[in-house]
Amino acid sequence: MPLTPTATRELLAQLGHQPKRFLGQNFLVDGNIVRKSLELAQVRRGDAVVEIGPGLGTLTGALLEAGAEVWAVEKDRTLHAHLSSTLQPRHPDTFHLLEADAVEHPLADLPAAHAAAFKIVANLPYAIATPWLDAVLGGPLPERMVLMLQQEAAQRYVAMPGSKSFGAISVFLQSAYEVAPGHRVEASCFFPRPDVDSYLLHLVRRAEPFVFTPEVKALIRSVFQQRRKQIGGLLRDRLPDHGASWLARLTAAGLSSLTRPEAIPTELWRALQVRES
C-alpha cells in the first residue's frame, strides 16, 4: 500500500479522488508511524482490531499483514470501493469492511463474540473524533486504543481537572482508560499535509473501567457547557431533589458549591452517577 506522498498522489489520481477536507482525509505516508501504531497497540496474530476511516488502506494493510482480523468502517464510497477491490480479495477471511458513518457504527459492526477482547487502531478523521469517541465509551470497551488525533484534541481528552481544556469528554475517557505514553506526529507524515501536528494517543482500559449512563453523560455535558458558572447553581437547576447530597461530597473533598465544573475531579463526577442510580 502507498506510503510516500508521490505514490499516494498517483493512486488518488488513478481513482479520480480528490481528498475531502470535510471528512478529514489526510492520508498517512510515513511507514515509521504505521509501525509505531502497531507497536503501541501490541497487535498480535489473531487479534480482533477495529479501524475507523481506513482510507487508502495503508494502516489496514499493516494490521492484516501482522495477522490481525480487521473490522473497518469507511464512509467514502470511492475509498470503500478501492479497499473492496484490493484488500478484501487478498484477505477474504480476515478483512471485514463496512460502508457507513463511523459515529453511527463506532465499532464497525464488530460481532458480539469479539466484544470482550478487541483493540482499536485508527488514523481517526479529525472531524468526528469527539462524537465517535463518546460513542465508543458507551461500551463495549476495547482493551487498548491507539488513535491518531489532532494534537489539540488529544490534549483535551487527557487534560487534568483545573485546566481550561478539561471537559466532559475528559471525564468520560479518563474514567474508563489510563493514558499510556504516546507519540507526537508531524504534519509532514500526511498527504495532503494538515495545518496542525497530530498525536498518537495510547489508551489502556482500566482494570475496573467506569461507564457513565446516557442520562448522566447528558447531565455532565450540559454542566460543562456552562463551565464558568458555579456548580451549586448548575445542579440546583438540573437536580433539584438530589443535588444537595452530591454537593456534600464536594465539601468533604475540600471543594464547595462555588467550584466551577472544570475544577471537579473525575472521581466526584463518577459519584454523581452512583448517587443517581
UniProtKB/Swiss-Prot annotation:
EC number(s) per entry: 2.1.1.182
Compartments in which it is found: Cytoplasm
HAMAP family in the record: 16SrRNA_methyltr_A
Function: Specifically dimethylates two adjacent adenosines (A1518 and A1519) in the loop of a conserved hairpin near the 3'-end of 16S rRNA in the 30S particle. May play a critical role in biogenesis of 30S subunits.
UniProt xrefs under InterPro entries: KsgA/Erm, rRNA_Ade_diMease-like_C, rRNA_Ade_Mease_Trfase_CS, rRNA_Ade_methylase_Trfase_N, rRNA_adenine_dimethylase, SAM-dependent_MTases_sf
The protein's name: Ribosomal RNA small subunit methyltransferase A
NCBIfam families: ksgA (TIGR00755)
Binding site for S-adenosyl-L-methionine: N26, L28, G53, E74, D101, N123
A Gene Ontology cellular-component term: cytosol
GO MF entry, a single one: RNA binding
Keywords: Cytoplasm, Methyltransferase, RNA-binding, rRNA processing, S-adenosyl-L-methionine, Transferase
Signal peptide limits: none
Annotated catalysed reactions: adenosine(1518)/adenosine(1519) in 16S rRNA + 4 S-adenosyl-L-methionine = N(6)-dimethyladenosine(1518)/N(6)-dimethyladenosine(1519) in 16S rRNA + 4 S-adenosyl-L-homocysteine + 4 H(+)
Family of the protein in this entry: Belongs to the class I-like SAM-binding methyltransferase superfamily. rRNA adenine N(6)-methyltransferase family. RsmA subfamily.
SUPFAM superfamilies registered for this protein in UniProt: S-adenosyl-L-methionine-dependent methyltransferases (SSF53335)
